[in-house]
């Protein structure tokens, strides 16, 4: 029983290490007014695993930090597209 508890405790400590935080810059060319970033940010914020969002109208970009164990770039671009603002990863 002690070995099982020790193994579970170790797994609980190590599990967060497996998940990696990633930051991606999305190009969102469809933002045409200063209120568009609000809609884009709201759409991205609904995606599970997103921890930080910075949307800038002037550059028409969204910089998103997320947990890649909970979401993916594809889910982020789908969220912006579903909100009416198609996006792609900026190279």
From Swiss-Prot:
Binding residues for Hg(2+): 33, 36
Signal sequence bounds: 1-19
Domain HMA: 22-88
Cellular localisation: Periplasm
Cellular component GO terms held in the UniProt record: periplasmic space
Keyword terms: Mercuric resistance, Mercury, Metal-binding, Periplasm, Plasmid, Signal
One Pfam family hit: HMA
MF terms (GO), sorted A to Z: mercury ion binding; mercury ion transmembrane transporter activity
Coiled-coil annotated residue ranges, if any: none
Subunit-structure text: Monomer.
Known role: Involved in mercury resistance. Acts as a mercury scavenger that specifically binds to a mercuric ion in the periplasm and probably passes it to the cytoplasmic mercuric reductase MerA via the mercuric transport protein MerT.
Family: Belongs to the MerP family.
Listed name of the protein: Mercuric transport protein periplasmic component
Gene that encodes it: merP
């Amino acid at each position: 029983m002690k070995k099982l508890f020790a193994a579970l405790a170790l797994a609980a400590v190590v599990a967060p290490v497996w998940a990696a935080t990633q930051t991606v810059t999305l190009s969102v060319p469809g933002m045409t007014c200063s209120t568009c970033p609000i809609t884009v940010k709201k759409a991205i914020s609904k995606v599970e695993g997103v921890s930080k969002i910075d949307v800038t109208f002037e550059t028409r970009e969204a910089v998103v930090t997320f947990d890649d164990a909970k979401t993916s770039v594809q889910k982020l671009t789908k969220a912006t597209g579903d909100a009416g603002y198609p996006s792609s990863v900026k190279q």
